[in-house]
Amino acid sequence: MIRNNNMEELALVYNMFQRRQASFELLRKHLAEFIVAEGSKLVSEEVKNDDLVVKMIDLRERVSGIQSKAMEKDAHIDMTIKMAFEKVVNVDNRTAKALVFYLDEMLKKDFKNINEAELTERLDKVIHIFRYLTDKDVFEGFYVNSFAKRLLEQRQICEDAETALVLKLKEECGCQFTQRLEVMFKDMKMSDELCQEFKSSPTSQGLEIDFSVKVITQGQWPNDKKETQFFQQIP
């Protein structure tokens, strides 16, 4: 019934099983086993990172639909769903990496034709999966690198979308979690302002190059030791 998504039959089963503790626990057990089985297949299969996230979101929406439509938004069922997903996504760091990759691909796209409501909906779906990660610092480490690359490349960056995601992460994990991201944002804005001031100054007149610099706060940006050593070897 769960696999077939038969809401009527699931509602009947829920109404019968919820009356007895042992039966209700059996229902929760079967639901958890279904989520773990389906989710584990996604994590273990050789699927692309963005496909993994899309399918994980679909799985969550599917079981959440069962909980809300067939099981009267039962809080115990909600806890069962949460614990099952936590078991799936915390086996290793694959899901954390996949979320960062998915967000990177999404945020690189042009958001001019997407309204605020649609942007919020898409980000919220990702945040739902993010909540299941127990070690969110792993996600933060991957995300900082991805975020820094997007800022430095400045290719098709949608500032509104980037800001919206940082705010959502801040709501979920607090100010300390997003401190580096906010500092990096400020660094880029300050760098852009300084470059514009220089280009408008008499000093820049007659230059045959497009002069641009990035001023970054020490200790806040990712530090690639290999890259640093490479540049130190240049005479």
Regions found by a protein language model. Name each.
Residues 1-235:
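Eukaryotic scaffold/interaction segments
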